[in-house]
């Protein structure tokens, strides 16, 4: 009897947890391109959906260009903390939000890249040979 009760409890918890509402934000089709000034970074941390990243290692100053729907752009943050370039949804959109952009193109470059971390449906293109002490 205890096993059956435990089974019903587990099934009930599973059903309740699967009912957590998620929000889907679709791109509005108003594609915009923004150049964002960034300081020196050697790590890329990417989070979100539908993102295509084109990275180039070069001696040029660090750069970041974002091309996406205006309504998607407004819900993301782009900043460098402790030499890590972080591209991710703003805090209020990190949980239970699906992004479906019309287009989400990130073009980034830096002098050095030690680490790359991506979460979500992100495609990364490395457009140059990488020279790194560790990777």
Which role does the model predict for each range below?
Residues 2-135:
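Intrinsically disordered, low-complexity terminal regions
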């Amino acid at each position: 009897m205890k096993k059956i009760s435990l089974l019903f409890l587990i099934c009930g918890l599973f059903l309740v947890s699967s009912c957590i509402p998620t929000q889907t934000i679709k791109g509005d089709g108003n594609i915009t391109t923004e150049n964002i000034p960034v300081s020196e970074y050697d790590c890329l941390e990417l989070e979100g959906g539908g993102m295509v990243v084109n990275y180039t290692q070069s001696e040029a100053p660090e750069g970041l260009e974002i091309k996406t729907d205006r309504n998607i752009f407004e819900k993301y943050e782009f900043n460098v903390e402790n030499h890590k370039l972080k591209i991710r949804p703003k805090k209020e959109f990190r949980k239970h939000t699906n992004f479906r952009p019309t287009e989400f193109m990130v073009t980034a470059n830096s002098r050095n890249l030690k680490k790359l971390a991506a979460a979500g449906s992100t495609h990364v293109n490395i457009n140059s040979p990488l020279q790194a002490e560790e990777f």
